[in-house]
Amino acid sequence: MIKNKILTATLAVGLIAPLANPFIEISKAENKIEDIGQGAEIIKRTQDITSKRLAITQNIQFDFVKDKKYNKDALVVKMQGFISSRTTYSDLKKYPYIKRMIWPFQYNISLKTKDSNVDLINYLPKNKIDSADVSQKLGYNIGGNFQSAPSIGGSGSFNYSKTISYNQKNYVTEVESQNSKGVKWGVKANSFVTPNGQVSAYDQYLFAQDPTGPAARDYFVPDNQLPPLIQSGFNPSFITTLSHERGKGDKSEFEITYGRNMDATYAYVTRHRLAVDRKHDAFKNRNVTVKYEVNWKTHEVKIKSITPK
């Protein structure tokens, strides 16, 4: 039986002074409880925070697993939101005949903690995924049994489950690092279909074309040849599952980072041809890191800080 019951208590958002600025927006959703049977329940919290400066939104769902048959506290963190591509076209100031396209080669998503009483016990997605559409499920059975299924339609009956689903056309997801205190993913450009066939994301001439006009935009392929992750941005959907030693500290802090690494492609016309230069990771780690505090007893979530402000 599942019931969605709105909590009467108001969640403290923790709007400390450094967050009160015009470049940051914070909101929260209603808090809910889901009964998953045998006296166990999921206490759900949601936090939204937007950095207007970097055009990044974190929508984070915190699902506390309250299960007397499991000897630890558990928390499922689903990381959603939006990371704008910030693709731009411009003339170089000192050399206006050189046109530049800045575009996201990689999107960054990570979670980490320094709490010695907290361990990362599961995460999605795992391994390397190169399919355009990604969909996976995390399931929980009473007693502390977390499992992952290969897809939303995967087999298995769970007391509680959480799914991820996102599109990464022309990109590939890789786990860059993982240990008991965190995990870091990179969603990286892979290959692109062009009028001249399949082209590697590392190709020097990628996206450049013979100019159709004098503007910087005219030196690069039109929007209908660019995937959504370059035209607009990326909607992440990632999950981490964390355990906490019961009775060892009421609060823990987690840092969640979203961002992008930007490549720069330069194009200009010489006497005889179009010349193209490429700088990989020209603007790296254009990230936003939000520090969250969770209370294992009251199941409250607070935003402690955001970097950069």
UniProtKB/Swiss-Prot annotation:
<dbReference type="GO" id="GO:0051715">
    <property type="term" value="P:cytolysis in another organism"/>
</dbReference>
<keyword id="KW-0843">Virulence</keyword>
<comment type="function">
    <text>Toxin that seems to act by forming pores in the membrane of the cell. Has a hemolytic and a leucotoxic activity.</text>
</comment>
<dbReference type="Pfam" id="PF07968">
    <property type="entry name" value="Leukocidin"/>
</dbReference>
<dbReference type="InterPro" id="IPR016183">
    <property type="entry name" value="Leukocidin/Hemolysin_toxin"/>
</dbReference>
<keyword id="KW-0354">Hemolysis</keyword>
<dbReference type="InterPro" id="IPR003963">
    <property type="entry name" value="Bi-component_toxin_staph"/>
</dbReference>
<keyword id="KW-0964">Secreted</keyword>
<protein>
    <recommendedName>
        <fullName>Gamma-hemolysin component A</fullName>
    </recommendedName>
</protein>
<keyword id="KW-0204">Cytolysis</keyword>
<comment type="subunit">
    <text>Toxicity requires sequential binding and synergistic association of a class S and a class F component which form heterooligomeric complexes. HlgA (class S) associates with HlgB (class F) thus forming an AB toxin in strains producing both gamma-hemolysins and leukocidins. HlgA and LukF-PV can also form a complex.</text>
</comment>
<feature type="signal peptide">
    <location>
        <begin position="1"/>
        <end position="29"/>
    </location>
</feature>
<dbReference type="InterPro" id="IPR036435">
    <property type="entry name" value="Leukocidin/porin_MspA_sf"/>
</dbReference>
<dbReference type="GO" id="GO:0005576">
    <property type="term" value="C:extracellular region"/>
</dbReference>
<keyword id="KW-0800">Toxin</keyword>
<comment type="similarity">
    <text>Belongs to the aerolysin family.</text>
</comment>
<keyword id="KW-0732">Signal</keyword>
<dbReference type="GO" id="GO:0090729">
    <property type="term" value="F:toxin activity"/>
</dbReference>
